[in-house]
Amino acid sequence: MRSGPPPRSARYRRGGLAALAAMALASGMMMTVGAPASSAAQARVDNPYEGATVYVNPDWSAKAAAEPGGEAVANEPTGVWLDRIAAIEGTDTARGLREHLDEALAQGADLIQVVIYNLPGRDCAALASNGELGPDELDRYQSEFIDPIAEIEHDSAYANLRIVNTIEIDSLPNLITNTGSRETATPECDTMKANGNYVNGVGYALGKLGGVDNVYNYIDAGHHGWIGWEDNFRPTAELIAQAANANGASPDDVAGFIANTANYSATTEPYFSIDDTVNGQKIRETTKWVDWNNYVDELTFAKDFRQALINAGLPSDIGGLIDTSRNGWGGSDRPTGPGPTTGTPDEYVDASRIDRRINPGNWCNQDGAGLGERPTASPEEGIDAYVWMKPPGESDGASEEIDNDEGKGFDRMCDPTYEGNPRNGYNPSGALPNAPISGAWFSDQFQQLVQNAYPPVS
């Protein structure tokens, strides 16, 4: 079990000038809005989110506030994505890492969330998020991407700011599920497993970015609808532990893991569980939705995966994050109770589940999704926070081929007319139409996320 007292469920404080001023007035505190944080270095804490004011990205906030209903959530903290070398210094349309860190200090924030996402041969099983570095360009990843980020994050000017890094989403799980003799294997993932550059890249990032008290690294662990099967679960945990000991890294460089990054899996399924039976038939064994998975939601998965990581050699005080940015599944189609037990197991599960995707393997711009639980510190034992690491409204990928200079291809899973592949059981993609490339603003999706938010937006 996690060391220390049982966690309390509490919204962590949000950055942003309006939020800070409101808190000051409500509490009677005297404070200077925009004053820089103290230059004294912080002592390392067990859970960086506990009691923290978390940075609100003004770039995302402005886009959200401009949408109908968006003002209600525009002051929520979201992740800052560094998905190519140019993103470190910033572009014509987005500020760079140092600008974000300086803005975090100006907001009086205690914590900023950064997504490190530019491995060589990135995302070997999804064309929509391919990156700029070739499979063999580990040296460039280290010297041109990780080293400059580390130099900025380790600047003493930011010593009193907790920096949470999400390390390389989707990378290590791909080496388990999309390689070798599996039907889902790709040549690209086989290459990355053989050359070791995912493991060594993650290890280098952990070792280089870690080692200072104010930086907290969380490794991506996929989600229950990907890793929840027995032949994926422990091997993924063991591979993460291997990466935490690779290329200069130590397990002490790992603060925890994150589940459901940029995905849509429900945090909890309130109306059915993995142990349910219908007419004497176990839903785990007889339904298309569960299909022998050991989990039906992210919270149960994350709690067990945390223990699997500890068993594999990571520190006993690691914590989990769950990305709840787009897994609310509210709106008129949300069930209000369990399905009928008079029909088939499939009918029961389909009527009970709040996750309304066609298949849990569908990941791109899902139709019907909604904003999920608002960012919250210590919601459950062993879970450091619910976070919005994926900024709601940013596309998962283009619904058709779009020329771009970011190395992002066209994945048919983002095409609403696509009928599927082995990774989603040959089901329709469930993707929204007219989507831009990954990371670009997708107004139609954001408006639907607000409309289908659960808890509802008020």
Predicted segments, located by residue:
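Substrate-binding cleft of secreted/luminal carbohydrate-active enzymes
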Residues: Q307, N311-S458
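Secretory targeting and sorting signals
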Residues: M1-A40
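N-terminal carbohydrate-binding/catalytic regions of secreted carbohydrate-active enzymes
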Residues: R44-D155, G372, M389-P456
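Substrate-binding surface in catalytic domains of secreted glycosidases
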Residues: T191, G222-A243, N247, P251-G313, ...
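Substrate-binding cleft of extracellular glycoside hydrolase catalytic domains
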Residues: G90-T91, D102-D110, V114-Y218, P235-Q242, ...
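Extracytoplasmic/secreted cell-surface and envelope-processing proteins
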Residues: G90-D92, R122-A125, N174-T177, W226-E230, ...
